[in-house]
């Protein structure tokens, strides 16, 4: 006689319920950590600590940031949370209660150069990424998720919650219908995100670029990545392709050539085409269209033809890296028609676009580099 099935509805123990209640508070108030993070960035706390020589006390911060002295106890509470979440580190104890703080690798990314310059010590400042991700427009779109799920839309790629709430498509000309500052914030965030970690790519994955004679950087923006490639590999002739509104009046300088166009229609021919943090903004159907154009732009594999893709690949071991990948995936769902993909998803896209093989280089933590061959 078969044994009795276990009771899956057995009530939790008192201890489990107490832990669950703490988890409920934590999940319900996660946004407070994000807003505290935004507050630190808007106040300029990372930059103030950096300019103080790497450590700063609460009185130092109050003075440097021109805050009312009466706010010192409240600043202590803010910093205590941000020390716990890893944004800052306590220089004098483990909790941050004593009130002297130093930068962590995370807050180092939020230091602004002199005069508000976007780069300090060679590291692209990521302040715009924080301001966009915690902006009212992004948060309002995320708050519309439940209504978005309930709405019956037959299209294979329905409008994103961002589009439904604000009537504009992120990074599209329709963003001009919103306040100009909103479009600027998101474009600055895209540029900062696009530039982040690329120096590491060139150091850790240099073999990907060796032997390449010419390269087209699709959606290459201001050409910073292309210029970095040429600096590291002077023999590579680089072309940047982006929308006319992005290219503007940029002209080739003998190092990088600029082409205004649409990657869905045509891509300037080159031995290699690079898509850096591009495809996760697009649906599977659109990705296949983009990759098909890439395939038309490159020669056969025997002649060195390949597509270089730098993007997130879901599949990190459980922990902060996987959580970051999953948060980025839902973030894409909120703001775009794209998504983050695991390696099987990427393989399916390559196959549908007519590519025969690929290699993957996993040296970039949450991201990876694909070399995709015709």
UniProtKB/Swiss-Prot annotation:
The active site is at 280 (proton acceptor). Pfam families: Dimerisation, Methyltransf_2. Its EC number is 2.1.1.-. One of its GO terms (biological process) is biosynthetic process. Belongs to the class I-like SAM-binding methyltransferase superfamily. Cation-independent O-methyltransferase family. COMT subfamily. InterPro entries: COMT-like, O_MeTrfase_dom, Plant_O-MeTrfase_dimerisation, SAM-dependent_MTases_sf, WH-like_DNA-bd_sf, WH_DNA-bd_sf. It comes from Oryza sativa subsp. japonica. Induction: Induced by UV-C. The keyword Membrane does not apply. The keyword Nucleotide-binding does not apply. This is Flavonoid O-methyltransferase-like protein Os11g0303600.
């Amino acid at each position: 006689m078969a044994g009795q099935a276990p009771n899956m509805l057995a009530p939790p123990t008192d201890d489990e319920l107490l832990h669950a209640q703490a988890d409920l508070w934590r999940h319900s108030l996660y946004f407070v950590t994000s807003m505290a993070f935004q507050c630190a960035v808007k106040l300029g706390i990372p930059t103030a600590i950096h300019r103080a020589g790497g450590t700063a006390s609460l009185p130092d911060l109050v003075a440097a940031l021109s805050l009312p002295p009466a706010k010192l106890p409240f600043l202590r509470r803010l910093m205590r949370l941000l020390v716990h979440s890893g944004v800052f580190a306590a220089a004098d104890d483990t909790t941050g209660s004593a009130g002297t703080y130093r930068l962590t690798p995370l807050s180092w990314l939020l230091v602004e150069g002199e005069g508000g310059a976007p780069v300090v010590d060679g590291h692209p400042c990521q302040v715009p990424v924080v301001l966009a991700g915690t902006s009212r427009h992004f948060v309002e779109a995320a708050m519309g998720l439940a209504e978005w799920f309930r709405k019956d839309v037959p299209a294979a790629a329905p409008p994103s919650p961002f589009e439904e709430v604000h009537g504009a498509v992120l990074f599209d000309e329709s963003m001009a219908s919103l306040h100009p500052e909103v479009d600027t914030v998101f474009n600055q965030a895209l540029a900062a995100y696009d530039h982040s970690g690329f120096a590491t790519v060139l150091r850790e994955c240099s073999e990907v670029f060796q032997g390449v004679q010419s390269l087209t950087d699709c959606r290459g923006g201001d050409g910073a990545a292309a210029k970095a490639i040429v600096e590291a590999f002077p023999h590579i002739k680089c072309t940047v392709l982006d929308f006319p509104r992005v290219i503007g009046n940029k002209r080739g300088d003998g190092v990088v050539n600029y082409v205004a166009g649409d990657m869905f229609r045509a891509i300037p021919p080159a031995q290699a085409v690079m898509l850096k943090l591009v495809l996760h903004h697009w649906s599977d159907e659109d990705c296949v269209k983009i990759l098909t154009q890439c395939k038309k732009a490159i020669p056969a594999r025997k002649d060195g033809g390949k597509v270089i893709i730098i993007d997130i690949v879901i599949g990190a071991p459980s922990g902060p890296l996987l959580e970051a990948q999953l948060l980025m995936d839902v973030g894409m769902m909120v703001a775009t028609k794209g998504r983050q993909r695991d390696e099987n998803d990427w393989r399916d896209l390559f196959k549908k676009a007519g590519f025969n093989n690929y290699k993957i280089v996993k040296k970039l933590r949450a991201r990876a580099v694909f070399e995709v061959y015709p």
